[in-house]
Amino acid sequence: MLEDFLKVMPLMTASGISILLILVEAATKNARITRLFAILGFLLVFLSLPFSPSEPDFAFSNMLQSGGFFTYTATVFSIGGLLITLISDKYLEMEDAHHGEYYIILFMAVVGMMLMSAAANLTILFIGLELMSIALYVLAGIMRDDQRSNEAAIKYFLLGAFASGIFLYGIALIYGATGTLYIPQISDHLAKNGFDTLFLSGIALLMIGLLFKVAAVPFHQWSPDVYEGSPTVATAFMATGAKAAALSSMILVGISIAPILETFTAWPTAIAMIATLTMFFGNIAALIQTNLKRMFAYSSIAHAGYMLIGIATGTDSGYAGVLYYIFLYTLMNIGAFGIIILVEQKHQFSELADYEGFFSRAPLLAFLMAMFMFSLAGIPPFGGFIAKYNVFSAAVQADMTWLAVAGVIASAVSVSYYLRVVIAMFMKDTKKQKLNPDPTATATIALVAFLVLLFGIYPSLLIEYTQHALAFAMK
């Protein structure tokens, strides 16, 4: 039993911290103290990462898998959770929503994400998905007195519950077709017996559930309204953590259905078409937005399309590209949303007009925001360029050159609305007073920007890690 705990130590640590936070909040009823324990908890999770073996192995009656893949994804989820925790407090206090349970729910969402990437059984994958989803529904409505927040939570819950039902039905069909819920055995069954219509129906429904979480077209309708209405700190976490967890699960599923990819070409073609529609719809819709949160919602849809390119290839290089992308996207998006959090006023929208002359109000924040915009647009030397290059080159290597070309065109379209933000900040005047942003949040965002630049100049620092993680994923 102790050996099993050590194999998935980050998950066990995060689960234990979640319970501890409940006790801390119940005893102190002080959100600041709960936040401090949450920060220490994430640091403990980081310290537990070396205990997880790099070689693939199984724990708890083969229900969970450990190894480099789990360690990498757990690192991404924990970094995202820690960054959100560091930049949340002042915003929540401003919105009269600084409740200790916010940090508890945030930690539980991270536990759900870790379960998804550690799942060796489809039942565990579903439990992780639901734990993450329910936590995100609550985070969307954490501003109890704000009608927009409540509306966002209800919309997310209703559509999310429907998607979860589809996901669960897919699991049932897969079990009916293969006789197992154990992911490696599904792969073995397909290799020996091939696949039938029942299995294809099941895997399609399962993928629809995951595509909903990444907000891919045509399962994206919820995201603009939910992202705009939710507290900005919750939006930042939804747009990054949920996507990273769902894409990690897609990689695990993709590895298990590898025999299909060799004989059933309609499968990668379908994913490629969804990726193409997602990229172009997200970018074109973002062009006409004047609200930054809504613009980033559509931008998030577009980035889901870029990452789906790597999934569509079905190759190790494609999956490694996705792993690199989810890490950089987590940094870029949380960094950009972090600046929105610092600028936002109580109960007000984040309009593009609010950023006119932003450089004269907060030069450092304007400079950092420009870095994030350039990186999200895929402009070198920032990490976003390398992230896109990796998935595009993987598509070319997989003889899907048309998909890579579509990605390049879609990325070129995105430059327009990202540059609109930069132009508004640096080339327009304002009479608004200077900002005095929270120093802790500013330092956190500056560190994130540094990492985005570092991984753009020295991508090998992270690429080797992603390749190692994939090499030691469950095969």
UniProtKB/Swiss-Prot annotation:
Keywords: Cell inner membrane, Cell membrane, Membrane, NAD, Quinone, Translocase, Transmembrane, Transmembrane helix, Transport. It comes from the Bacteria. GO terms for biological process: ATP synthesis coupled electron transport. It is an enzyme of class 7 (translocase). Its EC number is 7.1.1.-. One of its GO terms (molecular function) is NADH dehydrogenase (ubiquinone) activity. It is a multi-pass membrane protein. It catalyses: a quinone + NADH + 5 H(+)(in) = a quinol + NAD(+) + 4 H(+)(out). It is found in: Cell inner membrane. Its main location: membrane. GO terms for cellular component: plasma membrane. It holds the Pfam family Proton_antipo_M. The chain crosses the membrane at residues 8-28, 36-56, 67-87, 100-120, 122-142, 157-177, 199-219, 244-264, 268-288, 295-315, 322-342, 366-386, 403-423, 443-463. NDH-1 is composed of 14 different subunits. Subunits NuoA, H, J, K, L, M, N constitute the membrane sector of the complex. NDH-1 shuttles electrons from NADH, via FMN and iron-sulfur (Fe-S) centers, to quinones in the respiratory chain. The immediate electron acceptor for the enzyme in this species is believed to be a menaquinone. Couples the redox reaction to proton translocation (for every two electrons transferred, four hydrogen ions are translocated across the cytoplasmic membrane), and thus conserves the redox energy in a proton gradient. PANTHER family: NADH DEHYDROGENASE. Belongs to the complex I subunit 2 family. This is NADH-quinone oxidoreductase subunit N 1. It comes from Chloroherpeton thalassium (strain ATCC 35110 / GB-78).
